[in-house]
């Protein structure tokens, strides 16, 4: 059987908001030989002046538009889909996450990795993690959904930070200093691991560095999701510079 000359191991269809400028380069940085990423943009109005009241409804628009992005990317016959948008993958707790995953798979007729499932798989890969803290670019209403999901998966959420982005595009503008400050605020002896959600926050390398400072797992959503996709497809290549998840598990 003939194979794609570049994606001879796997073609990944990547689904991400049209406002997102981070997930595509992040995933490409973690790409291994024989795997190619094919980005399909989910139409997303760039709402400015987002509030706690409007964030949930604004991200639901992304969920509704995801099916169009799937139909588009499936024309290149990818073997697997990787979800590059995390908020909606946590909505509705454990059952809501599974329903969203199933909706994607039923439309595409191929497997898929989503941020919520990938994050919990990553935490379990490290082992021994019970108490977590997390940060997001979201608002408290969305953080409540993330908290609910992790707690239904058996983790205790000790604390969380919502950075309250002004708009969807401005998520990528949070500085490294701001993110370091958030990590320092989250860390403590009462926390076994820290998780970062929100795929437009560039934290794949910062999280890897923070693991060294804190001597505990720091899971970046983009790292977890791409790792999950690779391992789900039997690709066990180890990568360095992105934290223990990709180099050890």
Q: Can you name each region flagged by the protein language model?
A:
Residues 180-211, 225-226:
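Hydrophobic alpha-helical
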Residues 66, 70-112:
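Glycine/small-residue-rich loop that forms an oxyanion/phosphate-binding "nest" at active or ligand-binding sites
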């Amino acid at each position: 059987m003939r194979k794609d000359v570049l994606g001879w191991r796997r073609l990944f269809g990547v689904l991400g908001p049209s406002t997102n400028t981070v997930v595509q380069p992040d995933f490409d940085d973690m790409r291994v030989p024989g795997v190619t990423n094919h980005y399909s943009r989910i139409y997303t109005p760039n709402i400015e002046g987002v509030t706690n009241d409007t964030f949930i409804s604004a991200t639901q628009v992304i969920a509704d538009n995801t099916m169009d992005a799937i139909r588009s990317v499936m024309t290149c016959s990818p073997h697997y889909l990787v979800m590059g948008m995390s908020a909606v993958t946590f909505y509705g707790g454990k059952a809501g996450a599974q329903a969203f995953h199933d909706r994607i798979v039923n439309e595409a007729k191929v497997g898929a990795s989503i941020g919520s499932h990938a994050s919990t798989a990553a935490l379990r890969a490290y082992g021994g993690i019970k108490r977590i803290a997390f940060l997001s670019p979201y608002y408290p209403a969305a953080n409540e959904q993330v908290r609910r999901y992790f707690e239904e998966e058996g983790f205790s959420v000790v604390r969380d930070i919502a950075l309250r982005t002004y708009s969807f595009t401005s998520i990528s503008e949070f500085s490294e200093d701001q993110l370091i400050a958030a990590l320092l605020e989250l860390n403590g002896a009462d926390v076994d691991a820290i998780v970062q959600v929100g795929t437009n926050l560039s934290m794949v390398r910062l999280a890897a560095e923070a693991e060294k400072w804190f001597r505990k797992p720091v899971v970046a959503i983009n790292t977890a999701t791409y790792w999950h996709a690779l391992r789900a497809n039997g690709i066990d290549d180890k990568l360095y510079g992105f934290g223990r998840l990709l180099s050890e598990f």
